[in-house]
Amino acid sequence: MKTVTEFQNKNILVLGIAKSGYAAATLLQKLGANVIVNDGKPLAENVLAAELQAKGMDVVCGGHPLELLERNISLVVKNPGIPYSNPILVAAKEKQIPIVTEVELAYRISEAPFVGITGSNGKTTTTMLTFEMLKEGQKHPVIAGNIGTVACEVAQDAKENEVVVTELSSFQLMGVELFQPKIAAFLNLFEAHLDYHGTKKEYGLAKANIFKNXTENDYSVINADDADVMALSAYSKGQKVLFSTTKEIEDGACIKDNALYFKGEKVVEVGDIVLPGQHNLENILAAMSIAKLLGVSNEAITAVLKRFTGVKHRLEYVTTINNRKFYNDSKATNMLATEKALSAFTQPTVLLAGGLDRGNEFDDLIPYFKNVKAIVTFGQTAPKLVRAAEKAGLDTIESVDTLDEAVVKAYAHSTDGDVILLSPACASWDQFKTFEERGDIFIQAVHKLI
């Protein structure tokens, strides 16, 4: 365990509780900091805040008063979801108070090396694949970040011979100062989270923070097929390891002769991979690159790929009813994810889509509707998806209020041999707390049809 003294007797403001804020506050108190916790939700409605107050922390709820910054604050640890435009963060920046996220805190207290994985899509699948490959290769991985345990809950206990594998969002990466993963993987980039970042350029620069502190002793795993990612990799001083599904990469990972290769050596036959979807080959190449850089054998990688069928809510097979296959892709919170999901199937498909309106149209989906026989829309974006479906010339287009209704309608529009696919192309927050809740409700609704 790493001994950490830098926070002792320092006044540290934890802004926004939720799971990561709760873990950060608890850790900082353990490390001897004077922790002030602030959350916008009233204390009476905030179970986690009440628990932290019971631990003796100074808890302020119901808003973000600027007066908190007058308490000789040394550091602000913010919830990733709170935008930097929030007045208290603007004021903290003006006062030159460092602002970090929980992942930065985790890195500072750990003696274990980190693997960081970011991108617009495929992060969770790649992170899970990496974890499984490292585990199979006896490299003692610990999974943390957006999936698994909150990073700062496990980081201090992680030993030098272990590896902390983290899935990282742009929100988390905006708040890094010293964070220096031994291996940083950047999977892809497309326009997303513009309500938070403003422009695709700013979004990409936030992601590129994963390279911020890399040195020549570190590695950057880069998607050579993504021009934006390649351009942003210029920010890395680490050794670049490229992967591609479209061209041969001599000093990286690629597909050749129906097999996956790393630095010229065949690792696994494509036919041995059970994870469906062409897009998942990108995720596999990235995970394989990380595993090989950390010394995992081809045999261990192959063993994982022969059994790894995917991650819950990511093109997850649910069941078959009357020869109709149901798939839960609730994690598809943007168009690119839905494009890749639709590309994974050649069968006639009934698509369920819709959710939070972030201001974009859905015309980019039109070329991917070639196998879509019907669409059932729901949520705030239903009218926009209907417009895109009409432009695509779909004959069967229907809008409903709830996901339960959408499942019933989708089944009614299906016939023998069809795929019924939930791939919303939108975030879930208009009707659900999380994409996981949305996926679980979809699965429950499907089982009601039996």
From Swiss-Prot:
UniProt name for this protein: UDP-N-acetylmuramoylalanine--D-glutamate ligase
InterPro entries: Mur-like_cat_sf, Mur_ligase_C, Mur_ligase_C_dom_sf, Mur_ligase_cen, MurD
Organism: Bacillus cereus (strain ATCC 10987 / NRS 248)
Summary of the function given for this chain in its UniProt record: Cell wall formation. Catalyzes the addition of glutamate to the nucleotide precursor UDP-N-acetylmuramoyl-L-alanine (UMA).
A biological-process GO annotation: cell wall organization
GO molecular function: ATP binding; UDP-N-acetylmuramoylalanine-D-glutamate ligase activity
GO cellular component, one term: cytoplasm
Subcellular location: Cytoplasm
Domain of life: Bacteria
Major subcellular location class: cytoplasm
Keywords linked to the UniProt accession: ATP-binding, Cell cycle, Cell division, Cell shape, Cell wall biogenesis/degradation, Cytoplasm, Ligase, Nucleotide-binding, Peptidoglycan synthesis
